[in-house]
């Protein structure tokens, strides 16, 4: 995969491309794309017997404060295969801190033209409460058995905050390339 040729989205920060690394409900394996080669590597096998609560990936041509592309979860009724690109819109953000610093996770749903099931979801609060609880629980505990790794779950943010974080991550990536 030539990640450098995949745009941020067709209308960022409203509509973003998310490159999926881990499918919802998949085996407890953390995959990660090598941005230079485009190859999908096994980053690690989770030490906790937990499955990802949503399709997990990143937004290309963004840069988070931790030095990685902006992470995104895409809520959907189906798992997406690793390596696929999903057009999604951010509806919120979960602010985390881990051993590397701040680590925001965008919460997204597929754009209506891809899957209109979530067309009435404009904010994370529009999702069933249990979905948000599962996401928070997963990130609070998925590193529990890994030595020298930790996570602190912070506050949830709304769609406006998610869009602002995306704008800042796009700008940070542009500055890093300059």
In which residue ranges do the predicted regions lie?
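Hydrophobic N-terminal alpha-helices or hydrophobic patches in metabolic proteins across all domains
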Residues: 1-178
């Amino acid at each position: 995969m030539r990640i450098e040729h995949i745009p941020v989205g067709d209308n960022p920060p409203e509509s973003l491309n998310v490159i999926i690394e881990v499918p919802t409900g998949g085996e407890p394996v953390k995959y990660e794309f090598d941005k230079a080669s485009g190859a999908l590597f096994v980053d690690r096998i989770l030490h906790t017997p937990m499955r990802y609560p949503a399709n997990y990936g990143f937004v290309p041509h963004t840069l988070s404060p931790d030095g990685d592309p902006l992470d995104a979860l895409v809520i959907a009724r189906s798992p997406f295969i690793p390596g696929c690109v999903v057009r999604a819109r951010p509806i919120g953000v979960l602010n985390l801190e881990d051993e590397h610093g701040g680590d925001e996770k965008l919460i997204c749903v597929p754009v209506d033209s891809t899957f209109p099931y979530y067309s009435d979801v404009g904010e994370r609060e529009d999702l069933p409460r249990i979905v948000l609880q599962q996401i928070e629980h997963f990130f609070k505990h998925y590193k529990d058995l890994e030595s020298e790794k930790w996570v602190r779950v912070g506050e949830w943010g709304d769609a406006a905050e998610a869009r602002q974080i995306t704008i800042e991550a796009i700008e940070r990536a542009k500055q890093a390339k300059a």
